[in-house]
Amino acid sequence: MASSTSARTPAGKRVVNQEELRRLMKEKQRLSTNRKRIESPFAKYNRLGQLSCALCNTPVKSELLWQTHVLGKQHRERVAELKGAKGATQGPSAGTAPQPTKRKTTDVESQDAKKAKASVDQVQPSTSASSANFEKSGKEATRVASSKTGLGLLPDYEEEEEEEEEEELGGGEERRDSSKHLPDAQGREHSLASPRETTSNVLPNDPFNTNPPKAPLVPHSGSIEKAEIHEKVVERRENTAEALPEGFFDDPEVDAKVRKVDAPKDQMDKEWDEFQKAMRQVNTISEAIVAEEDEEGRLDRQIGEIDEQIECYRRVEKLRNRQDEIKNKLKEVLTIKELQKKEEENVDSDDEGELQDLLSQDWRVKGALL
């Protein structure tokens, strides 16, 4: 009974399983990430939803730090390099594009267009409509192909695609203008006499044409052009890296990376290893010198000690000789003293004998003391 009552939940509350709770948390997290998703050509999300910069190839921790990364020095340098590469690639293309249109317009204007004005007015709407339809279909095909292939390309080339589309639009307008002039020539040819038609059947249309007909423009995704642009950008970057002086960038790591030189840390490690090797060599040489000096000092000390020992032995010999001399002198003095004592004893014994003799005599006798 107690277990059943404890298993019950209080009234008015809903029991949520752990799986459902996890699902709700994941959904909430997905909604929050979708809300904060950054819309930028350089922002890239992986399958885990982590933000990174495709231009710098650096991960960004959160969407709040994206603005600081965009304002950073490394990102701005990469954007400037990309803009410089775009200017370098657009320069020659812009200079060479208008040439064929100029040739066409000059060739068409040189012809007599006054004779075929009526026929031109009839043919012009149909040709302009067909050219417009062709341009629209080409643009749609290029847009579809670019949308398919753009998924595999880096986002830093999206701006290049837009600029290429603008250039194609400009070229389409020029082609429209030229197509307006071409029907003039066609109408004029239709209005000409039959002898000219016979000559055209015999001879080719333009036997002295120095300009060969150009291949029709086929809409494509622009991957070939982008590969060429990428190669030009890489070559330009290599040339700039070779031309840049040392210390061009404030950050030493970026400077070394651009100039294709070892990083300062690696350079310092190499210098530290070389310094340690040199110190080891110096230490070995100094140790050998110290060992030689120690050996010489040891020999000098041994020679000095031997000299001191010899001097000490000499002093000991002198002291021994002096001791022997003093001993001999003492012996002589002692022998002399003994002899003197013996003599004195003999003299004393003689005096005592005489005194005893005198005392033994009778002093009263006349002439006894004499």
From Swiss-Prot:
Coiled coil: 16-40, 310-338
Posttranslational mods: Phosphorylated in response to DNA damage by the cell cycle checkpoint kinases ATR/ATM.
Record region (Disordered): 1-21, 75-220
Organism: Rattus norvegicus (Rat)
InterPro entries: Matrin/U1-like-C_Znf_C2H2 (IPR003604), ZNF830-like (IPR040050), Znf_C2H2_sf (IPR036236), Znf_C2H2_type (IPR013087)
Residue ranges, compositional bias (Basic and acidic residues): 104-115, 172-191
UniProt keyword Cell cycle present: yes
Gene: Znf830
Function: May play a role in pre-mRNA splicing as component of the spliceosome. Acts as an important regulator of the cell cycle that participates in the maintenance of genome integrity. During cell cycle progression in embryonic fibroblast, prevents replication fork collapse, double-strand break formation and cell cycle checkpoint activation. Controls mitotic cell cycle progression and cell survival in rapidly proliferating intestinal epithelium and embryonic stem cells. During the embryo preimplantation, controls different aspects of M phase.
Compositionally biased intervals (Acidic residues): 156-171
Protein name: Zinc finger protein 830
